[in-house]
């Protein structure tokens, strides 16, 4: 499967690299070195990292993530993923959950203002939830209000890309929803100048539309740069905004075309698809064994 041809950079374009789920501790070293080279060569206007910098929020994992982020030398915003909250230290998880981001705290949940475009954060990873599976997303009223206020404050004519970790898809009942409050958030975003919602979490790229009572919202998911692949090789998204059209390419080391990289629905988690009906990318690089988790 041949890769998409790389278009020449239009000076009037805004170029954004959408990276997710690097999972330092189980990172793919070839993939992160390649992305670093791509950033140095193409000099994107911004890099949006949509969560799960680490595997288990260990100090050494954050130290490696900090070194990598600092080496990129471009405007960056980082969303917090469920894997980035302290896993073993519950006191720290509840009282100082972002403590281990020291060194890159200035870019955590940071709004980036670009020519005609803003990247606005929306927090979906929380310390605790009234359900057993805390790895899933939960949007609080305060987090949604903060995001909407930021979008409403943008200058007239400026579009927004909303950066989250969990896709804003509610699957099943409230107890099993991938992101509790996701549909409410999408409905509110549909009433605003939002180009799309950038997410991670599920380790496969996608470019889908979710309907709401106020119209459709584009949902753009990035793959992973870790060893924990689902059905596609490690990848990131290259976004180009020319003032009218937002194009998305799923860049990858496997030279696979974007359309062969993207799944056609949002799965409930990042585990490789083993059951009938689970979304699988056309390239179908499902690992024979489940990836490591530690």
Region roles according to the model:
Residues 32-33, 61-65, 139-142, 176-185:
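Charged helix-capping and loop-helix junction motifs
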Residues 25-27, 55-60, 82-90, 126-132, ...:
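Active-site environment of divalent metal-dependent phosphoester hydrolases
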Residues 1-71, 87-88:
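N-terminal active-site segment of His-dependent metallophosphoesterases
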Residues 1, 241-294:
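A short C-terminal boundary segment appended to hydrolase-like catalytic domains
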Residues 151-171:
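Short acidic, glycine-rich surface-loop motifs adjacent to enzyme active sites
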Residues 63-146, 154, 188-190, 213-215, ...:
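Extended active-site neighborhood of metal-dependent phosphoesterases/phosphodiesterases
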Residues 174-244:
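Conserved beta-sheet core of the metallophosphoesterase superfamily
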Residues 18-20, 47-52, 76-82, 123, ...:
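Active-site neighborhood of phospho(di)ester-bond hydrolases with catalytic His/Asp-centered motifs
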